[in-house]
């Protein structure tokens, strides 16, 4: 179990709500891959758990589904509602879903469960509110994600603003009591400069540490050091994400 400050996470994503869609390329790429595992596309009651500003809520609604958008961040829900992305909007925590058993045909959670204190509980909750014959689809980040950031930060006399993600084996263990199938993918994204890479993390609310929060501003000298040590190639300054996709069919 991880030590997670839910209020701080909600605030971090709340601050990012207005700019989230500009920086959410990873979420969209990951979500498109996750959607490929769906057995049905329309005519379902769908829960988007950890909906953010509702990009995939809108995707599922446009496909002909009744969508409930849930998020820990009130600001994200305001953004989702302003864009008319779903049919219902519900503040809530994935680890304590405010729904009855078997409420949805599809429980969808794209890059949200990594913020949970207890992944096993989160997966159990998603499974609980899924109807028999329905499906749970989720994606998350695993250990070694953002290793380029860790490597570049090491020479600096500062704590790296890198969240601690669970290793793949721990993710599998969290769902061992459930009919869970996992797939893995590594996605590497290039940025034109170090600031763009850092802003991509801040823009999606992902700079909050599970255990404490990095404080202080980066100096010009720090940025120069990061540029020297940050792994890069023809694509630019790199950030790699180790993605895990989970599929559960409700029995």
UniProtKB/Swiss-Prot annotation:
EC number(s)?
2.1.1.197
What catalytic activity is recorded?
malonyl-[ACP] + S-adenosyl-L-methionine = malonyl-[ACP] methyl ester + S-adenosyl-L-homocysteine
Metabolic or biological pathway: Cofactor biosynthesis; biotin biosynthesis
Q: Which domain of life is it from?
A: Bacteria
Biological process GO annotation list? biotin biosynthetic process; methylation
Checking Pfam families in the record gives:
Methyltransf_11 (PF08241)
- One Gene Ontology molecular-function label: malonyl-CoA methyltransferase activity
* Keyword flag Zinc: no
Cite the entry's keywords alphabetically.
Biotin biosynthesis, Methyltransferase, S-adenosyl-L-methionine, Transferase
Q: Which NCBIfam families match?
A: BioC
Family to which the UniProt record says this protein belongs? Belongs to the methyltransferase superfamily.
Which PANTHER family does the record cross-reference, listed alphabetically? Answer: ARGININE-HYDROXYLASE NDUFAF5, MITOCHONDRIAL (PTHR13090:SF1)
Q: What does this protein do?
A: Converts the free carboxyl group of a malonyl-thioester to its methyl ester by transfer of a methyl group from S-adenosyl-L-methionine (SAM). It allows to synthesize pimeloyl-ACP via the fatty acid synthetic pathway.
Q: What is this protein called?
A: Malonyl-[acyl-carrier protein] O-methyltransferase
Gene of this entry: bioC
